[in-house]
Design a protein with these regions (language model features):
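Gly/Trp-centered helix-boundary motif
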Residues: 1-267, 271, 389, 406, ...
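Short juxtamembrane loops and helix-capping segments at transmembrane helix boundaries
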Residues: 298-305, 395-427
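Transmembrane helix boundary and interhelical loop/hinge segments in multi-pass membrane proteins
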Residues: 342-351, 449-456
Length: 460
Protein backbone atom coordinates (compact mmCIF):
# COMPACT_ATOMS: atom_id res chain seq x y z
CA UNK A 1 0.00 0.00 0.00
CA UNK A 2 1.46 3.31 -1.07
CA UNK A 3 1.77 5.98 1.56
CA UNK A 4 0.81 9.54 0.62
CA UNK A 5 3.05 12.06 2.33
CA UNK A 6 1.39 14.69 4.50
CA UNK A 7 0.60 17.93 2.64
CA UNK A 8 0.70 21.23 4.43
CA UNK A 9 -1.84 23.70 2.90
CA UNK A 10 -0.58 27.08 1.85
CA UNK A 11 -2.47 30.39 2.06
CA UNK A 12 -2.75 30.72 -1.73
CA UNK A 13 -4.60 27.42 -1.87
CA UNK A 14 -7.58 29.13 -0.25
CA UNK A 15 -7.82 31.99 -2.78
CA UNK A 16 -11.31 31.98 -4.46
CA UNK A 17 -11.34 30.83 -8.11
CA UNK A 18 -11.89 33.46 -10.83
CA UNK A 19 -15.50 33.72 -12.03
CA UNK A 20 -15.93 34.22 -15.81
CA UNK A 21 -19.35 35.55 -16.86
CA UNK A 22 -18.73 34.73 -20.53
CA UNK A 23 -18.78 31.01 -19.82
CA UNK A 24 -22.47 31.18 -18.95
CA UNK A 25 -23.38 33.73 -21.66
CA UNK A 26 -25.67 33.06 -24.63
CA UNK A 27 -23.66 32.07 -27.70
CA UNK A 28 -26.26 33.55 -30.09
CA UNK A 29 -29.67 35.15 -29.63
CA UNK A 30 -32.58 32.78 -29.90
CA UNK A 31 -34.25 32.86 -33.31
CA UNK A 32 -37.95 33.37 -33.69
CA UNK A 33 -40.05 31.00 -35.78
CA UNK A 34 -40.03 33.33 -38.80
CA UNK A 35 -36.32 34.17 -38.48
CA UNK A 36 -35.43 30.49 -38.50
CA UNK A 37 -37.78 29.88 -41.45
CA UNK A 38 -36.12 32.69 -43.42
CA UNK A 39 -32.67 31.26 -42.64
CA UNK A 40 -33.66 27.82 -43.92
CA UNK A 41 -35.36 29.32 -46.98
CA UNK A 42 -32.14 31.17 -47.88
CA UNK A 43 -30.20 27.93 -47.52
CA UNK A 44 -32.45 26.32 -50.15
CA UNK A 45 -30.86 27.41 -53.43
CA UNK A 46 -33.73 26.32 -55.65
CA UNK A 47 -36.26 28.22 -53.55
CA UNK A 48 -34.02 31.30 -53.40
CA UNK A 49 -33.49 31.32 -57.18
CA UNK A 50 -37.25 30.89 -57.63
CA UNK A 51 -37.89 33.83 -55.31
CA UNK A 52 -35.48 35.98 -57.34
CA UNK A 53 -37.24 34.94 -60.56
CA UNK A 54 -40.64 35.85 -59.12
CA UNK A 55 -39.38 39.26 -58.00
CA UNK A 56 -37.92 39.73 -61.48
CA UNK A 57 -41.27 38.83 -63.07
CA UNK A 58 -43.03 41.36 -60.85
CA UNK A 59 -40.55 44.07 -61.85
CA UNK A 60 -40.94 42.99 -65.50
CA UNK A 61 -44.72 43.42 -65.25
CA UNK A 62 -44.86 46.59 -63.14
CA UNK A 63 -41.79 48.60 -64.15
CA UNK A 64 -41.14 47.15 -67.61
CA UNK A 65 -43.97 49.04 -69.41
CA UNK A 66 -42.70 52.29 -67.87
CA UNK A 67 -39.25 51.73 -69.38
CA UNK A 68 -40.36 50.17 -72.69
CA UNK A 69 -43.18 52.53 -73.67
CA UNK A 70 -44.47 50.76 -76.76
CA UNK A 71 -48.18 50.33 -77.35
CA UNK A 72 -48.86 46.55 -77.32
CA UNK A 73 -51.66 47.03 -79.88
CA UNK A 74 -49.66 49.17 -82.32
CA UNK A 75 -48.95 47.44 -85.62
CA UNK A 76 -45.69 47.76 -87.54
CA UNK A 77 -46.78 46.51 -90.95
CA UNK A 78 -43.23 46.64 -92.29
CA UNK A 79 -42.02 44.16 -89.68
CA UNK A 80 -44.70 41.48 -89.53
CA UNK A 81 -43.60 38.24 -87.80
CA UNK A 82 -40.11 39.65 -87.46
CA UNK A 83 -37.72 37.34 -85.59
CA UNK A 84 -35.52 38.69 -82.75
CA UNK A 85 -32.33 40.29 -84.01
CA UNK A 86 -33.50 40.37 -87.62
CA UNK A 87 -32.26 43.03 -90.01
CA UNK A 88 -34.42 46.14 -89.69
CA UNK A 89 -32.77 48.27 -92.36
CA UNK A 90 -34.96 49.69 -95.14
CA UNK A 91 -33.99 51.47 -98.33
CA UNK A 92 -35.59 54.76 -99.35
CA UNK A 93 -37.61 54.54 -102.58
CA UNK A 94 -39.94 56.84 -104.46
CA UNK A 95 -43.68 56.68 -103.75
CA UNK A 96 -45.61 53.97 -105.57
CA UNK A 97 -46.41 54.66 -109.20
CA UNK A 98 -48.73 52.85 -111.59
CA UNK A 99 -46.97 50.19 -113.68
CA UNK A 100 -47.92 49.63 -117.31
CA UNK A 101 -46.10 46.31 -117.74
CA UNK A 102 -42.83 47.56 -119.21
CA UNK A 103 -39.47 46.10 -118.25
CA UNK A 104 -36.80 48.24 -116.59
CA UNK A 105 -33.34 48.47 -118.20
CA UNK A 106 -31.22 45.46 -117.34
CA UNK A 107 -34.14 43.11 -116.72
CA UNK A 108 -34.66 41.82 -120.25
CA UNK A 109 -34.92 38.07 -120.73
CA UNK A 110 -37.16 35.15 -121.62
CA UNK A 111 -39.79 33.16 -119.77
CA UNK A 112 -41.01 34.11 -116.30
CA UNK A 113 -38.82 36.97 -115.08
CA UNK A 114 -38.69 40.14 -113.03
CA UNK A 115 -39.53 43.44 -114.70
CA UNK A 116 -37.55 45.42 -112.12
CA UNK A 117 -35.92 44.95 -108.72
CA UNK A 118 -38.31 43.25 -106.28
CA UNK A 119 -39.06 45.02 -103.02
CA UNK A 120 -41.71 45.07 -100.30
CA UNK A 121 -43.63 47.69 -102.28
CA UNK A 122 -44.28 45.43 -105.29
CA UNK A 123 -43.00 42.41 -107.21
CA UNK A 124 -43.48 42.95 -110.96
CA UNK A 125 -43.37 39.89 -113.22
CA UNK A 126 -43.27 39.43 -116.99
CA UNK A 127 -43.54 36.32 -119.18
CA UNK A 128 -43.61 35.42 -122.86
CA UNK A 129 -46.37 33.73 -124.82
CA UNK A 130 -46.89 30.03 -124.00
CA UNK A 131 -48.15 28.36 -127.18
CA UNK A 132 -48.71 24.94 -125.58
CA UNK A 133 -51.32 26.18 -123.06
CA UNK A 134 -54.88 27.43 -123.25
CA UNK A 135 -54.68 29.57 -120.11
CA UNK A 136 -52.25 30.30 -117.27
CA UNK A 137 -52.34 30.42 -113.48
CA UNK A 138 -49.82 32.20 -111.27
CA UNK A 139 -48.89 30.86 -107.82
CA UNK A 140 -46.80 32.20 -104.95
CA UNK A 141 -45.12 30.12 -102.26
CA UNK A 142 -42.73 30.71 -99.39
CA UNK A 143 -41.20 27.24 -99.84
CA UNK A 144 -39.31 25.87 -102.86
CA UNK A 145 -41.36 23.80 -105.30
CA UNK A 146 -41.00 20.15 -104.27
CA UNK A 147 -41.68 16.86 -106.03
CA UNK A 148 -45.37 17.00 -105.07
CA UNK A 149 -45.65 20.24 -107.06
CA UNK A 150 -47.05 22.21 -104.13
CA UNK A 151 -47.19 25.59 -105.86
CA UNK A 152 -48.64 27.47 -102.90
CA UNK A 153 -51.18 30.28 -103.08
CA UNK A 154 -52.90 30.96 -106.44
CA UNK A 155 -52.80 34.72 -106.88
CA UNK A 156 -53.97 35.21 -110.48
CA UNK A 157 -55.43 33.36 -113.46
CA UNK A 158 -55.26 34.47 -117.09
CA UNK A 159 -57.75 33.45 -119.77
CA UNK A 160 -55.14 33.51 -122.55
CA UNK A 161 -51.63 32.11 -122.73
CA UNK A 162 -50.15 35.12 -124.45
CA UNK A 163 -47.38 37.35 -123.18
CA UNK A 164 -48.43 39.06 -119.98
CA UNK A 165 -47.43 40.79 -116.79
CA UNK A 166 -48.53 40.84 -113.16
CA UNK A 167 -47.85 43.07 -110.17
CA UNK A 168 -47.90 41.35 -106.76
CA UNK A 169 -48.47 43.65 -103.77
CA UNK A 170 -50.02 41.11 -101.41
CA UNK A 171 -48.48 41.28 -97.92
CA UNK A 172 -44.85 41.36 -99.05
CA UNK A 173 -42.13 41.06 -96.42
CA UNK A 174 -38.34 40.69 -96.71
CA UNK A 175 -38.17 37.02 -97.67
CA UNK A 176 -37.67 34.67 -100.59
CA UNK A 177 -40.82 33.97 -102.61
CA UNK A 178 -41.21 31.25 -105.22
CA UNK A 179 -43.48 32.17 -108.15
CA UNK A 180 -44.82 29.50 -110.52
CA UNK A 181 -46.59 30.08 -113.84
CA UNK A 182 -48.58 26.88 -114.49
CA UNK A 183 -49.95 25.96 -117.92
CA UNK A 184 -53.66 24.99 -118.05
CA UNK A 185 -55.60 23.05 -120.68
CA UNK A 186 -59.04 23.85 -122.06
CA UNK A 187 -60.75 22.34 -118.99
CA UNK A 188 -58.71 24.49 -116.61
CA UNK A 189 -56.56 21.60 -115.37
CA UNK A 190 -52.80 21.75 -115.05
CA UNK A 191 -50.85 20.15 -117.87
CA UNK A 192 -47.92 19.51 -115.53
CA UNK A 193 -45.73 22.09 -117.25
CA UNK A 194 -44.74 25.24 -115.39
CA UNK A 195 -42.13 27.96 -115.09
CA UNK A 196 -40.77 28.94 -111.68
CA UNK A 197 -38.84 31.92 -110.37
CA UNK A 198 -37.27 32.55 -106.95
CA UNK A 199 -37.52 36.21 -105.93
CA UNK A 200 -35.64 37.84 -103.07
CA UNK A 201 -37.74 40.71 -101.71
CA UNK A 202 -35.96 43.73 -100.24
CA UNK A 203 -37.53 45.97 -97.59
CA UNK A 204 -38.17 49.55 -98.72
CA UNK A 205 -39.85 52.64 -97.32
CA UNK A 206 -40.77 56.08 -98.63
CA UNK A 207 -39.66 59.40 -97.19
CA UNK A 208 -43.25 60.23 -96.24
CA UNK A 209 -43.49 57.00 -94.23
CA UNK A 210 -40.20 57.79 -92.49
CA UNK A 211 -41.53 61.20 -91.54
CA UNK A 212 -44.89 59.81 -90.38
CA UNK A 213 -43.28 57.19 -88.12
CA UNK A 214 -40.61 59.60 -86.87
CA UNK A 215 -37.80 57.19 -87.66
CA UNK A 216 -35.45 60.08 -88.48
CA UNK A 217 -35.55 63.50 -86.86
CA UNK A 218 -34.48 65.40 -90.00
CA UNK A 219 -35.82 63.96 -93.27
CA UNK A 220 -34.64 66.82 -95.46
CA UNK A 221 -31.27 65.16 -96.05
CA UNK A 222 -32.71 61.78 -97.06
CA UNK A 223 -32.32 60.71 -100.68
CA UNK A 224 -33.52 57.79 -102.78
CA UNK A 225 -31.31 54.78 -102.04
CA UNK A 226 -30.39 55.79 -98.48
CA UNK A 227 -31.00 53.31 -95.67
CA UNK A 228 -32.86 53.93 -92.41
CA UNK A 229 -33.45 51.69 -89.42
CA UNK A 230 -37.01 50.75 -88.59
CA UNK A 231 -38.39 50.60 -85.05
CA UNK A 232 -36.54 48.26 -82.68
CA UNK A 233 -38.31 45.09 -81.50
CA UNK A 234 -35.91 43.15 -79.22
CA UNK A 235 -38.08 40.01 -79.13
CA UNK A 236 -39.52 40.42 -82.60
CA UNK A 237 -43.12 40.98 -83.69
CA UNK A 238 -46.19 38.78 -84.06
CA UNK A 239 -48.30 38.03 -87.13
CA UNK A 240 -49.88 41.50 -86.96
CA UNK A 241 -46.60 43.37 -86.48
CA UNK A 242 -47.15 44.02 -82.76
CA UNK A 243 -44.16 44.22 -80.42
CA UNK A 244 -43.83 40.91 -78.54
CA UNK A 245 -41.80 42.38 -75.65
CA UNK A 246 -44.48 44.98 -74.93
CA UNK A 247 -47.23 42.36 -75.19
CA UNK A 248 -45.36 40.05 -72.81
CA UNK A 249 -45.08 42.86 -70.25
CA UNK A 250 -48.75 43.78 -70.42
CA UNK A 251 -49.71 40.12 -70.58
CA UNK A 252 -47.71 39.53 -67.41
CA UNK A 253 -49.86 42.15 -65.67
CA UNK A 254 -53.02 40.28 -66.62
CA UNK A 255 -51.65 36.84 -65.75
CA UNK A 256 -50.10 37.92 -62.45
CA UNK A 257 -53.20 39.94 -61.51
CA UNK A 258 -55.36 36.85 -61.85
CA UNK A 259 -52.62 34.70 -60.32
CA UNK A 260 -52.48 36.82 -57.15
CA UNK A 261 -55.99 38.23 -56.69
CA UNK A 262 -57.97 35.02 -57.20
CA UNK A 263 -55.83 32.86 -54.84
CA UNK A 264 -55.79 35.58 -52.18
CA UNK A 265 -59.58 35.75 -52.17
CA UNK A 266 -60.37 32.05 -52.29
CA UNK A 267 -57.61 31.18 -49.79
CA UNK A 268 -59.08 33.73 -47.35
CA UNK A 269 -62.52 32.22 -47.91
CA UNK A 270 -61.12 28.73 -47.35
CA UNK A 271 -59.29 29.82 -44.17
CA UNK A 272 -62.44 31.34 -42.67
CA UNK A 273 -64.58 28.36 -43.64
CA UNK A 274 -62.09 25.70 -42.52
CA UNK A 275 -61.27 27.44 -39.23
CA UNK A 276 -64.96 27.76 -38.39
CA UNK A 277 -65.68 24.11 -39.21
CA UNK A 278 -62.67 22.82 -37.29
CA UNK A 279 -63.31 24.96 -34.22
CA UNK A 280 -67.02 24.19 -33.91
CA UNK A 281 -66.62 20.48 -34.68
CA UNK A 282 -69.38 17.92 -34.28
CA UNK A 283 -72.37 17.87 -36.60
CA UNK A 284 -71.75 21.41 -37.80
CA UNK A 285 -68.27 20.39 -38.94
CA UNK A 286 -69.68 17.35 -40.76
CA UNK A 287 -72.34 19.38 -42.56
CA UNK A 288 -69.88 22.10 -43.57
CA UNK A 289 -67.33 19.61 -44.92
CA UNK A 290 -69.99 17.69 -46.87
CA UNK A 291 -70.88 20.99 -48.55
CA UNK A 292 -67.17 21.49 -49.35
CA UNK A 293 -67.12 18.01 -50.92
CA UNK A 294 -70.12 19.00 -53.03
CA UNK A 295 -68.30 22.12 -54.29
CA UNK A 296 -65.24 20.02 -55.19
CA UNK A 297 -67.43 17.82 -57.40
CA UNK A 298 -68.67 20.78 -59.49
CA UNK A 299 -67.10 20.95 -63.01
CA UNK A 300 -65.01 24.10 -63.32
CA UNK A 301 -65.22 24.48 -67.10
CA UNK A 302 -69.01 24.14 -67.13
CA UNK A 303 -69.40 26.79 -64.44
CA UNK A 304 -66.95 29.03 -66.28
CA UNK A 305 -69.29 28.90 -69.29
CA UNK A 306 -72.34 29.54 -67.06
CA UNK A 307 -70.68 32.55 -65.42
CA UNK A 308 -69.86 33.98 -68.85
CA UNK A 309 -73.53 33.70 -69.77
CA UNK A 310 -74.62 35.26 -66.47
CA UNK A 311 -72.23 38.20 -66.88
CA UNK A 312 -73.27 38.68 -70.51
CA UNK A 313 -69.83 37.96 -71.96
CA UNK A 314 -70.21 37.46 -75.70
CA UNK A 315 -67.79 36.05 -78.29
CA UNK A 316 -64.61 38.10 -78.52
CA UNK A 317 -65.17 39.81 -75.14
CA UNK A 318 -62.78 39.51 -72.22
CA UNK A 319 -63.76 36.94 -69.58
CA UNK A 320 -61.55 38.10 -66.70
CA UNK A 321 -64.44 38.76 -64.28
CA UNK A 322 -66.16 35.37 -64.88
CA UNK A 323 -62.76 33.69 -64.50
CA UNK A 324 -62.13 35.38 -61.13
CA UNK A 325 -65.62 34.52 -59.89
CA UNK A 326 -65.30 30.89 -61.00
CA UNK A 327 -61.95 30.49 -59.25
CA UNK A 328 -63.18 32.10 -56.02
CA UNK A 329 -66.43 30.11 -55.91
CA UNK A 330 -64.97 26.70 -56.78
CA UNK A 331 -61.34 26.63 -55.59
CA UNK A 332 -61.64 27.30 -51.83
CA UNK A 333 -62.43 23.75 -50.50
CA UNK A 334 -58.80 22.56 -50.70
CA UNK A 335 -57.65 25.37 -48.39
CA UNK A 336 -60.64 24.81 -46.10
CA UNK A 337 -59.72 21.14 -45.65
CA UNK A 338 -56.11 21.91 -44.76
CA UNK A 339 -56.99 24.65 -42.26
CA UNK A 340 -59.73 22.50 -40.69
CA UNK A 341 -57.26 19.67 -40.10
CA UNK A 342 -54.78 22.05 -38.46
CA UNK A 343 -57.45 23.63 -36.26
CA UNK A 344 -58.73 20.22 -35.13
CA UNK A 345 -55.20 19.42 -34.00
CA UNK A 346 -54.47 22.78 -32.38
CA UNK A 347 -57.71 23.05 -30.40
CA UNK A 348 -56.64 20.04 -28.29
CA UNK A 349 -53.37 21.67 -27.24
CA UNK A 350 -52.80 22.57 -23.59
CA UNK A 351 -52.41 26.30 -24.20
CA UNK A 352 -55.88 26.40 -25.80
CA UNK A 353 -57.37 24.82 -22.67
CA UNK A 354 -55.44 27.31 -20.53
CA UNK A 355 -56.81 30.21 -22.59
CA UNK A 356 -60.34 28.90 -22.10
CA UNK A 357 -59.81 28.70 -18.34
CA UNK A 358 -58.62 32.31 -18.37
CA UNK A 359 -61.87 33.38 -20.03
CA UNK A 360 -60.88 33.65 -23.71
CA UNK A 361 -63.88 33.60 -26.05
CA UNK A 362 -64.12 31.66 -29.31
CA UNK A 363 -63.24 34.62 -31.53
CA UNK A 364 -60.08 35.30 -29.54
CA UNK A 365 -59.02 31.65 -29.68
CA UNK A 366 -59.47 31.46 -33.44
CA UNK A 367 -57.85 34.79 -34.32
CA UNK A 368 -55.09 34.79 -31.69
CA UNK A 369 -54.05 31.15 -31.48
CA UNK A 370 -55.44 28.93 -34.21
CA UNK A 371 -55.09 30.93 -37.43
CA UNK A 372 -51.58 32.27 -36.56
CA UNK A 373 -50.44 28.71 -35.86
CA UNK A 374 -51.76 27.59 -39.25
CA UNK A 375 -50.04 30.46 -41.08
CA UNK A 376 -47.31 28.18 -42.41
CA UNK A 377 -49.87 25.91 -44.07
CA UNK A 378 -51.76 28.94 -45.39
CA UNK A 379 -48.63 30.48 -46.96
CA UNK A 380 -47.64 27.20 -48.60
CA UNK A 381 -51.19 26.74 -49.92
CA UNK A 382 -51.20 30.28 -51.29
CA UNK A 383 -47.83 29.75 -52.97
CA UNK A 384 -49.09 26.64 -54.76
CA UNK A 385 -52.42 28.31 -55.62
CA UNK A 386 -50.77 31.16 -57.56
CA UNK A 387 -49.23 29.01 -60.35
CA UNK A 388 -52.44 26.99 -60.56
CA UNK A 389 -54.45 30.18 -61.17
CA UNK A 390 -51.91 31.46 -63.73
CA UNK A 391 -51.99 28.18 -65.61
CA UNK A 392 -55.80 28.12 -65.51
CA UNK A 393 -55.94 31.63 -66.98
CA UNK A 394 -53.42 30.69 -69.67
CA UNK A 395 -55.38 27.56 -70.58
CA UNK A 396 -58.74 29.36 -70.76
CA UNK A 397 -57.24 32.20 -72.81
CA UNK A 398 -55.62 29.61 -75.07
CA UNK A 399 -59.01 28.04 -75.86
CA UNK A 400 -60.67 31.46 -76.21
CA UNK A 401 -62.61 31.58 -72.92
CA UNK A 402 -60.32 33.86 -70.93
CA UNK A 403 -58.74 37.15 -71.93
CA UNK A 404 -59.87 38.12 -75.42
CA UNK A 405 -57.77 39.97 -78.02
CA UNK A 406 -56.52 42.64 -78.39
CA UNK A 407 -55.85 42.56 -74.63
CA UNK A 408 -52.59 40.61 -74.36
CA UNK A 409 -52.18 37.61 -72.10
CA UNK A 410 -49.67 34.80 -72.20
CA UNK A 411 -52.35 32.23 -72.98
CA UNK A 412 -53.88 34.14 -75.89
CA UNK A 413 -50.39 34.91 -77.25
CA UNK A 414 -49.60 31.18 -77.22
CA UNK A 415 -52.82 30.50 -79.09
CA UNK A 416 -51.94 33.10 -81.73
CA UNK A 417 -48.38 31.78 -82.01
CA UNK A 418 -49.61 28.24 -82.60
CA UNK A 419 -50.79 29.16 -86.11
CA UNK A 420 -47.29 30.32 -87.14
CA UNK A 421 -45.31 27.77 -85.12
CA UNK A 422 -43.57 26.22 -88.12
CA UNK A 423 -42.61 29.43 -89.93
CA UNK A 424 -42.16 31.86 -87.02
CA UNK A 425 -41.62 29.80 -83.83
CA UNK A 426 -40.64 32.79 -81.68
CA UNK A 427 -44.30 33.87 -81.51
CA UNK A 428 -45.09 30.68 -79.56
CA UNK A 429 -41.80 30.15 -77.74
CA UNK A 430 -41.66 33.41 -75.77
CA UNK A 431 -45.12 33.31 -74.10
CA UNK A 432 -44.76 29.56 -73.49
CA UNK A 433 -41.39 30.07 -71.80
CA UNK A 434 -42.80 32.80 -69.55
CA UNK A 435 -45.72 30.57 -68.52
CA UNK A 436 -43.38 27.65 -67.81
CA UNK A 437 -40.86 29.72 -65.83
CA UNK A 438 -43.56 31.39 -63.74
CA UNK A 439 -45.35 28.14 -62.87
CA UNK A 440 -42.07 26.34 -62.12
CA UNK A 441 -40.74 29.21 -59.97
CA UNK A 442 -43.87 29.35 -57.81
CA UNK A 443 -43.92 25.57 -57.38
CA UNK A 444 -40.26 25.45 -56.34
CA UNK A 445 -40.82 28.36 -53.96
CA UNK A 446 -43.79 26.50 -52.49
CA UNK A 447 -41.61 23.43 -51.89
CA UNK A 448 -39.01 25.61 -50.20
CA UNK A 449 -41.58 27.35 -48.00
CA UNK A 450 -43.09 24.02 -46.99
CA UNK A 451 -39.69 22.83 -45.76
CA UNK A 452 -38.77 26.16 -44.18
CA UNK A 453 -42.03 26.49 -42.24
CA UNK A 454 -42.00 22.90 -40.98
CA UNK A 455 -41.77 23.28 -37.18
CA UNK A 456 -40.18 19.84 -36.83
CA UNK A 457 -37.11 21.07 -38.73
CA UNK A 458 -36.68 24.21 -36.64
CA UNK A 459 -33.40 24.84 -34.81
CA UNK A 460 -33.65 25.93 -31.17
Amino acid sequence: MNHTPNYSPKPEDFTPAHYDDDIHGIARPSRSYWQDAWRRLRANRRALVSLILIVGLLLFALIGPLLWQVDPSRQDIDQVSQAPGADRAASIVAPYEYWSGKSAPGFEGEGLRLAQEANSQAVRLLWDEVSSATSLRLYRNIFPIDEQLAFGLPIAEFASAGAGYYEDRLDLTPDTYYYSLVELDASGQSTGTFQSLAVEVKRVITIDEVRERQLVLDTTELNIGDEVLLALHPLGTDYLGRDILSRLMHGARVSLFIGFVAPMLYVLLGVAYGATAGFLGGKIDQVMMRFADFVVALPFLLFMILFQVVFGIGPGESGIIPLLVALIVLAWPATARLVRGQVLQIREEAYISASRLLGANSRYLVLRHMIPNTMGVILVTLTFAVPSAIFTEAFLSFIGMGVAPPTPSWGSMSNEGLATMLTHPHELIFPSVFISITVLAFNLLGDGLRDALDARMRDV
